Every structure is written in structure tokens, then in C-alpha cells.
Curated annotation (Swiss-Prot):
Function (record text): Pseudogene resulting from a nucleotide deletion that introduces a premature stop codon at position 66. This is the C-terminal fragment. The intact protein (AC A0A140NCB4) hydrolyzes deaminated glutathione (dGSH, 2-oxoglutaramate) to alpha-ketoglutarate (alpha-KG) and cysteinylglycine, has less activity against alpha-ketoglutaramate (a-KGM) and no activity on glutathione or L-glutamine. May function as a metabolite repair enzyme.
Gene label: ybeM
Record organism: Escherichia coli (strain K12)
Entry-linked Pfam families: CN_hydrolase
Family indicated by similarity: Belongs to the carbon-nitrogen hydrolase superfamily. NIT1/NIT2 family.
Top-level taxon of the source organism: Bacteria
Coiled coil, from the record: none
Record-annotated CN hydrolase domain positions: 1-163
InterPro entries reported for this sequence: C-N_Hydrolase (IPR003010), C-N_Hydrolase_sf (IPR036526), UPF0012_CS (IPR001110)
Stated name of the protein: Putative protein YbeM
């Protein structure tokens, strides 16, 4: 069964919206996620017109693997990725309109690899292309290795992702089991 994940702006209150990630399976909405971390950085203030969400999306089941949802600026906050990994996520999906700017491409690639390593999850990141955004969609394996990538132009990228690879990496690099403490809300 095909799973489609997309982002839209959904009205919240008059003149405002949620930056919403929606997951569809067989034409039905199976998950909604209102972006937690609004992009109020690099001279942009998303919070002027967008309301922050307040819940982590439930994990999805896709082809026998558990998938966590994040979007864009959420990438800079490792707690969200970690919380989903601790719930059992094996893949983290992140659509993003990553705005161009000094060192932004470096931030994108570094943070994607870091989140894969922090969580020992695959990262599937769809980067919006265009004049303002960097594109650079990527699939990164749980060891932080890019296994598929696109440039700044629209492209279809594919890679094999398997639960066996997640188990193999987690056996070699058991960071989720080796954690000694965390704030209570992340347990």
C-alpha cells in the first residue's frame, strides 16, 4: 500500500494556520502533525502567521517498518527525533522548505546525518526546490551514510530501507540503550 506524506497550511484561527504534515494511505488520512518548532530564525518569523502544534505525531506502519514524522525546522531539535526513536521509529520522514543562506546547505547535510546517528533511524528528507530553497533531498541510513541524494533540481530518489539494517546498526551502535538519563517528557 502506498503512503503519501505532504505538507499543507490548515486554518487554525482567523488569519492564522498550522503548518500541517498529513500522511495518507489508501486515500485515507492516517496521521496529522502540526509543526512543533516554528522557523523564527535567519530573519524569518514563521510565527507571525502560523501557530505551533503541541503533539508528536503517532508512528505510522509502512511496509512493516515504523515511521516517525517531522518537518523542516524540527530537524534542529534532536529531542523530537529521539522521542520517536524511543517509541520504536525506524525511519524518520522530514519534508522541508530549507531556505537558502550562508552555510545552510552544510547545516542541512550535517543535521540529517546527526539525526540518523542520534536515533539509529533512516532519515528520508524531501527538500523543496526553487529560487528560495536548497532542494537536496536525501535518504540517509542509520549509520549516517547518504544512500540516495538529489541536487537543487526536482528529482526522484530511491533507496532500499530494511528493518534488518536498523537492527544491525543498533546492535553495533546501541545509543538508544546506552542512554543514562533524559528529561521525563522524553522517556
Amino acid at each position: 500500500m502506498m503512503t503519501t506524506i505532504l505538507t499543507i497550511h490548515v486554518p487554525s484561527t482567523p488569519g492564522r494556520a498550522w503548518n500541517m504534515l498529513v500522511a495518507l494511505q489508501a486515500g485515507n488520512i492516517v496521521a496529522r502533525y502540526a509543526k512543533l518548532h516554528l522557523y523564527d530564525a535567519f530573519a524569518i518569523q514563521e510565527s507571525r502567521r502560523v501557530d505551533a502544534g503541541n503533539e508528536i505525531a503517532p508512528l505510522l506502519e509502512v511496509e512493516g517498518m515504523k515511521v516517525g514524522l517531522m518537518t523542516c525546522y524540527d530537524l534542529r531539535f534532536p529531542e523530537l527525533a529521539l522521542a520517536q526513536a524511543l517509541q520504536g521509529a525506524e525511519i524518520l520522514v522530514l519534508p522541508a522548505a530549507w531556505v537558502r543562506g550562508p552555510l545552510k546547505e552544510h547545516h542541512w547535510s550535517t543535521l540529517l546525518a546527526a539525526r540518523a546517528l542520534d536515533t539509529t533511524c533512516y532519515m528520508v528528507a524531501a527538500g523543496e526546490c526553487g529560487n528560495k530553497n536548497i532542494g537536496q533531498s536525501r535518504i540517509i541510513d542509520p549509520f549516517g551514510v547518504t544512500i540516495a541524494a538529489a541536487s537543487e533540481m526536482p528529482a526522484l530518489i530511491m533507496a532500499e530501507v530494511t528493518p534488518e539494517r536498523v537492527r544491525q546498526v543498533r546492535a553495533q551502535l546501541p545509543v538508544l540503550n546506552n542512554r543514562r538519563f533524559a528529561p521525563p517528557q522524553l522517556l
